[in-house]
């Protein structure tokens, strides 16, 4: 099972190696603006799932939001430690 750290390591590897057809690479190539739009979209989907859908659906939407937030972190050059110090 993935956790926040293993997901970040996996995404960092994809950002470094840029495998062809990678969704992560495509999202990074869309830049901070494009990634930010995706974060906003996913945040709305989290809210809607939490409000109107099952716990399973809400958990899935939250996982997708976490993915896009980590891609945004990579695009900005942020590390997990950069974020953790604000928790």
Curated annotation (Swiss-Prot):
GO terms for cellular component: cytoplasm. It comes from the Bacteria. Pathway: Amino-acid biosynthesis; L-histidine biosynthesis; L-histidine from 5-phospho-alpha-D-ribose 1-diphosphate: step 2/9. It is found in: Cytoplasm. Its EC number is 3.6.1.31. It catalyses: 1-(5-phospho-beta-D-ribosyl)-ATP + H2O = 1-(5-phospho-beta-D-ribosyl)-5'-AMP + diphosphate + H(+). One of its GO terms (molecular function) is phosphoribosyl-ATP diphosphatase activity. CDD domains: NTP-PPase_HisE. Gene3D superfamilies: MazG-like (1.10.287.1080). HAMAP family: HisE. This is Phosphoribosyl-ATP pyrophosphatase. It comes from Pseudarthrobacter chlorophenolicus (strain ATCC 700700 / DSM 12829 / CIP 107037 / JCM 12360 / KCTC 9906 / NCIMB 13794 / A6).
């Amino acid at each position: 099972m993935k956790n926040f750290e293993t997901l970040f390591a996996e995404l960092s590897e994809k950002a470094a190696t840029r495998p062809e057809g990678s969704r992560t690479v495509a999202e990074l190539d869309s830049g901070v603006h494009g990634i930010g739009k995706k974060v906003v979209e996913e945040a709305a989907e989290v809210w809607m799932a939490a409000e109107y859908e099952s716990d399973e659906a809400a958990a899935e939407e939250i996982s997708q939001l976490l993915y896009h937030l980590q891609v945004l972190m990579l695009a900005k050059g942020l590390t997990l430690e950069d974020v953790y110090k604000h928790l």
